[in-house]
Amino acid sequence: MTLWLPASGKIYLPPTPPVARVQSTDEYVERTDIYYHATSDRLLTVGHPYFDVRSQDGQKIEVPKVSGNQYRSFRVTFPDPNKFALADMSVYDPDKYRLVWACKGLEIGRGQPLGVGTTGHPLFNKVRDTENSSNYQNTSTDDRQNTSFDPKQVQMFIIGCTPCLGEYWDKAPVCDNAGDQTGLCPPLELKNSVIEDGDMFDIGFGNINNKTLSFNRSDVSLDIVNETCKYPDFLTMSNDVYGDSCFFFVRREQCYARHYFVRGGAVGDAIPDGTVNQNHNYYLPAKNGQGQRTLGNSTYFPTVSGSLVTSDAQLFNRPFWLQRAQGHNNGILWGNQMFVTVADNTRNTNFTISVSTENGGAQEYDSANIREYLRHVEEYQLSFILQLCKVPLNAEVLTQINAMNSGILENWQLGFVPTPDNSVHDTYRYITSKATKCPDAVPETEKEDPFGQYTFWNVDMTEKLSLDLDQYPLGRKFLFQAGLQTARTRAVKRPLVRKSSKSVKRKRTQ
């Protein structure tokens, strides 16, 4: 980075050369006129919308958690274009170039009807409605109620060649000289982590780690009470020097405060009064004997609502074309992979399934003999338009790529070749027998996946590419908008008129 910094005086001096500069992929990647279409199978998932259903011993997950308020992080793998047997070998010289994919367009298809799902908690920490209070209510030791609500409406997707980065607030470590922190609010710090498949997004209670910041397990709904709600870190990804984590994003969020409640429990930060020399600055105390003499809780909070769900505001089931990315990477898929992070709770209907606990079936309604179950289903289909590109193998370009990610050059088999060793080595015939020494313990080195520690929904596209773009819906849309589709005109056939050279004599009538 070239930054102008102040010197010891009052004059700002320019940076001293040489200064490293990150080039855009448009400066060294050569694009061709060859396009491929790739589409996935229909991707389905079924589970419980609030939590994992485990076995009796708790060791095995029998029904996974599948919520409409979860991120779907797809890791899409494409074939290596350098292994393609191209019909026209004049496209590139393998001694001078390497082939890469560039994303030109995509469409995220979503099945299932639009619907609003609710979430809640059977022991939700709320005292009462504070919007329209009729009397001053005193609290007890436990005022939790069974409450449900609909979450904030979210539609969002982020694409890149590295995983999407998320942010959330968590408990920060206290200083050594802080003393006893029992009963005090912990310090907070902003943390970053990769958004994995199944992570929860914000539904109206903020992007925080509820596992460490919700001691009573009643401040939020069941689906996030034991989870960390993440929000995409758009600021960090937009300032990424290489621009790999976010080519572009589409976002639509909406909510409004539907109900206004107050928390139960003692107030941690009391309203300033005379004990801190702030008497009568915030309120005038009530008379003795009145209920208002003892102040109620002032920890107010709303439960939000996502409001109307309509097909007019859908971001899915429509194509998006990438002409210019927000960062230096203009859609080049390094490593032949793409990460698609999706958040959508506009299809948030939860199925209610009832079964009888009696073998013969019930003749009359009895709630004790009926068992209710909850299930949530999701349906996706991913389609892409890929452009074949060439990367020249010159020193300047290879230096840039090596500084960005040395694993790319290893995949291209352009690694450093050591000088051959001319020394004589010993080779035993029966190395595994007891008559010879133990074989050298050389572990087999396997290439480490840089994203293997994260959980993604893996989508294999290695056998899904096609040059026949006009045979697919997204391909036809791409050909039309790019002006590459040839118009098929049909000549209008007219009936032939036969002309006779002989003149017809008219008969004279009398």
From Swiss-Prot:
Q: Does the keyword Disulfide bond apply?
A: yes
- Entry's localization field: Virion; Host nucleus
GO annotation (BP), single = virion attachment to host cell
Return the InterPro entries for the record.
Answer: Capsid_L1_Papillomavir, Capsid_L1_sf_Papillomavir, dsDNA_vir_gr_I_capsid
Could you tell me the keywords of this UniProt record? Capsid protein, Disulfide bond, Host nucleus, Host-virus interaction, Late protein, T=7 icosahedral capsid protein, Viral attachment to host cell, Viral penetration into host cytoplasm, Virion, Virus endocytosis by host, Virus entry into host cell
Any single GO molecular-function term of the entry would be: structural molecule activity
Pfam families the record matches: Late_protein_L1
> Is the keyword Glycoprotein assigned to this protein?
no
Q: How does it assemble?
A: Self-assembles into homopentamers. The capsid has an icosahedral symmetry and consists of 72 capsomers, with each capsomer being a pentamer of L1. Interacts with the minor capsid protein L2; this interaction is necessary for viral genome encapsidation. Interacts with protein E2; this interaction enhances E2-dependent replication and transcription activation.
The name on file for this protein is Major capsid protein L1
